[in-house]
């Protein structure tokens, strides 16, 4: 949608998936309203919450500093992928930015990101981020991983260095890739970035400014570990065929990714003191690695579904 409006607004829709976020969604929306370069709209989808999330979001409308705030509800909890697809289907701008309802942007996030996108052919840009605050704050340096790989796509496949709430991407590229896979209950964002960037030569950027703060909820980082592992292995197998068009060993990248996923699970189970699941993960590791290898070498790749139609409305996959 073209506009002749003041330069303090950018042609961006912010996609906010929210679930049981009544206590945090105001902070998220306030960080959008505080941008030095404002998006034209924020589209919130309340994914079946029972705590008044949608009402808490709607209450922020008078404080959005001219940004259109549109809030939608679903009757049941369908997951973040489905909620984001609904928000994308409702969006009206050529650029999409993503922010979850418990996290926040720093004030210059959108201005700095759009400076790396406008006038270029890049399909998306992302950046570093913070976790924690004060003395416990940690700067996560995503740009180093981006710069550290001869092929950024292979590096992304191996190390998953794009944080979803830092991304601004072209709406048409998101739609062409098919949107978020709602069947993946974890890592839908990682799957979509790989789908958008898998064609060799697709330009994207990760820059080194920490313009996002992730708020780690108690237990959140340690929840759904087994589900994250299963989804991660499925995604690794899904994009194995795309590695064959790249320099280097596709099998080595597959093994690297599957191993990294298991090491992450082991760290979580170790921190929890869950010895049973830790030992089970160690025992299953070689079998999962072998199964992924055999599947990738012997079976034809399953096509990725289309979860947004070509006109950007929500599809069924």
What are these regions (language model features)?
Residues 108-139:
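Conserved donor NDP-sugar-binding/catalytic core segment of glycosyltransferases
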Residues 74-91, 112:
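Glycine-rich, basic loop-to-helix element that forms the pyrophosphate-binding segment
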Residues 146-235:
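Conserved nucleotide-sugar donor-binding catalytic segment
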Residues 96:
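Short aromatic/hydrophobic "clamp" motif used to bind/position activated sugar donors
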Residues 30-39:
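Short, acidic, metal-binding catalytic loop of nucleotide-sugar glycosyltransferases
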Residues 31, 46-55, 76, 100:
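A conserved acidic beta->alpha catalytic loop
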Residues 4, 191, 198, 204, ...:
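C-terminal subregions of glycosyltransferases and related glycan-biosynthesis enzymes
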Residues 1-31:
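N-proximal low-complexity "stem/linker" segments adjacent to membrane-targeting elements
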């Amino acid at each position: 949608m073209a506009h002749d409006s003041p330069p303090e607004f950018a042609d961006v829709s912010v996609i906010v998936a929210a679930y049981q976020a009544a206590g945090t969604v105001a902070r998220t929306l306030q960080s959008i309203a505080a941008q030095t370069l404002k998006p034209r709209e924020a589209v919130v989808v309340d994914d079946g919450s029972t705590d008044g999330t949608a009402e808490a979001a709607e209450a922020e409308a008078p404080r959005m500093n001219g940004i259109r705030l549109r809030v939608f509800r679903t009757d049941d909890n369908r997951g973040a992928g489905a909620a984001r697809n609904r928000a994308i289907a409702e969006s009206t701008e050529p650029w999409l930015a993503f922010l979850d309802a418990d996290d926040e942007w720093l004030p210059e996030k959108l201005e700095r990101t759009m400076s790396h996108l406008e006038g270029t052919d890049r399909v998306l840009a992302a950046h570093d981020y913070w976790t924690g605050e004060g003395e416990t704050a940690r700067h996560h340096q995503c740009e180093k991983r981006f710069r550290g790989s001869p092929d950024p796509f292979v590096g992304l496949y191996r190390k998953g260095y794009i944080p979803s709430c830092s991304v601004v991407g072209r709406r048409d590229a998101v739609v062409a890739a098919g949107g978020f896979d709602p069947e993946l209950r974890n890592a839908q964002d990682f799957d979509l970035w790989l789908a958008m960037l898998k064609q060799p030569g697709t330009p994207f950027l990760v820059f080194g400014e920490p313009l996002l703060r992730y708020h780690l909820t108690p237990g959140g980082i340690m929840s759904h570990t087994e589900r994250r592992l299963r989804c991660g292995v499925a995604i690794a197998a899904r994009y194995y065929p795309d590695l064959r068009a790249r320099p280097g060993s596709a099998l080595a990248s597959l093994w690297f990714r599957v191993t990294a996923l298991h090491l992450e699970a082991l760290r979580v189970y170790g921190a929890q003191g869950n010895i049973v699941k830790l030992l089970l993960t160690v025992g299953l590791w070689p079998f999962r690695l072998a199964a992924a290898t055999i599947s990738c070498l012997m079976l034809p790749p399953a096509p990725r579904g289309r979860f947004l139609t070509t006109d950007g409305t929500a599809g069924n996959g």
